[in-house]
Amino acid sequence: MDIQMLGFLVFFGFMAAFIDSVVGGGGLISIPALLWTGLPPVTVLGTNKAAAVMGALTSFVAFVRSGRVDMWLIKRLFPLSLLGSGFGVLAVRMVPPDILRPLVVVMLIAVLVYSVLKKDWGRENHYAGLSARLLLLSCLVSFSFGFYDGFFGPGTGSFLLFAFLLVGFDFLGAAANARALNFASNISAAVLFTYFGLVDFSYAIPMGLAMIAGAWCGARMALSRGTGYVRPLFILMTTVLIGKQLVDLFK
């Protein structure tokens, strides 16, 4: 790999993780950058996951240290997201993931419309714990979005953040807890892609190191600027995701 390609991957890895560390959607930047290297598409996905898990760990640690992650809840949901993602990666080898694209577009539009119309939603933290019924539902949601992230992926960050908003977290708290579950699904996917020989570490390592820096800066920015920063970024990235999925749907 020449110095120009290295600089290219480092720059876009940093930018992808900076955004992904708060609201997700970093794959919109990192995957096209990796495709530019000429790697096969399936290896691009594996290499991206291997790099992204480094950034995901970094933002997870930053949010945990800030006290924004509800460890009682995450300890129960983390293993389910990990397990779901593993099943998702296995399923993608048997079923074409594009069958989900129309449903994903509809769901992302619903998330966007609701978030835009509810202007005061997520400004303050109203989370006061979960009933047994809501905890069971949260476990199911965690497994399902873990599976989705391993199987298809686009919009996982938006869906997870939205789910935490629904149970009462503010935007910053929702982003922090969503990052925790996204880290879990990234671990499982990265391990399995590596096992199947679908990771090119000559690209994954430099991009991953850049993602560590980007994720740390992104998480610190979110923590310092708060909910007023996270909400518009969430709306922007969800809008971009919808546009990207519509382009792919009608391509």
Give the location of each predicted region.
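Helix-loop junctions at the membrane-solvent interface of multi-pass transporters
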Residues: 22, 65, 94-95, 117-118, ...
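Transmembrane helix exit motif
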Residues: 57-68, 105-130, 240-251
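Selected transmembrane alpha-helices and immediately adjacent juxtamembrane segments
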Residues: 1-40, 125-175, 205
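Selective hydrophobic functional segments
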Residues: 46-99, 106, 186-232, 236
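Residues within membrane-spanning alpha-helices of integral membrane proteins
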Residues: 6, 49, 104-108, 112, ...
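Hydrophobic alpha-helical transmembrane segments in multi-pass integral membrane proteins
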Residues: 144-154, 189, 194, 241-251
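Residue-level signature of the transmembrane alpha-helical core
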Residues: 10, 14, 18, 49, ...
